[in-house]
Amino acid sequence: MIEVRRISEGVPLDFEVVVREGEGVTRHHVTMSREMCERLTASRHTPERCLEAVFRFLLDREPKESILGRFDVTVISRYFPEFERELAHYLWRS
């Protein structure tokens, strides 16, 4: 289960993301600009929905314990070049 909570309306937007899988729980502090969210979602989804999709994408590629504890969404493409291209599939999945 992925829980996304917005903790700041500033620039960039600031979130706490909690991932519960199996026995464990991880917490992540994630930032994302409004512009990045609009680009990733074609302005069709909320930032919270965008981050849920981001974490589903990441969890398909690595265990929750390997996801950075603190990061900006822009760094994901450094590790996974396919990120922006593939994210749409995760946004439209229920």
State what each model feature region is.
Residues 69:
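Metal- or metallocofactor-binding catalytic centers and their adjacent structured scaffolds
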Residues 62-66, 88-91:
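Residue-level signal for secondary-structure boundary elements
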Residues 1-41, 73-94:
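N-terminal intrinsically disordered, cationic/polar leader segments
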Residues 31-64:
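Acidic, aromatic-enriched beta-alpha/helix-loop junctions
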